[in-house]
Amino acid sequence: MAKKEDTIVLEGRVEELLPGMHFRVMLENGVPITAHLCGKMRMSNIRLLVGDRVTVEMSTYDLTKARVVYRHR
């Protein structure tokens, strides 16, 4: 399991909704990644739409997948 020190926090915009609560997110630096909602966002029933600004956490081991940890207002 990755520790907090092993994560990279970035911001991006939701580009596409994928099946299974996954999302295509375009990062600020122009790199597209696949992301899923973190557990607390699922429990709070927070939904994402195309165009939402989000904060994602990425593991240093796999830079193509991320976890959405915050949806900006």
Curated annotation (Swiss-Prot):
Family from the record: Belongs to the IF-1 family.
Domain of life: Bacteria
Keyword rRNA-binding: yes
Record keywords: Cytoplasm, Initiation factor, Protein biosynthesis, RNA-binding, rRNA-binding
GO terms of molecular function: ribosome binding; rRNA binding; translation initiation factor activity
Lineage: Bacteria, Pseudomonadati, Chlamydiota, Chlamydiia, Chlamydiales
Name of the protein: Translation initiation factor IF-1
SUPFAM superfamilies per the UniProt record, alphabetical: Nucleic acid-binding proteins
Location(s), subcellular: Cytoplasm
Record gene name: infA
GO cellular component entries: cytosol
Domain S1-like: 1-73
Function as written in the Swiss-Prot or TrEMBL entry: One of the essential components for the initiation of protein synthesis. Stabilizes the binding of IF-2 and IF-3 on the 30S subunit to which N-formylmethionyl-tRNA(fMet) subsequently binds. Helps modulate mRNA selection, yielding the 30S pre-initiation complex (PIC). Upon addition of the 50S ribosomal subunit IF-1, IF-2 and IF-3 are released leaving the mature 70S translation initiation complex.
UniProt subunit comment: Component of the 30S ribosomal translation pre-initiation complex which assembles on the 30S ribosome in the order IF-2 and IF-3, IF-1 and N-formylmethionyl-tRNA(fMet); mRNA recruitment can occur at any time during PIC assembly.
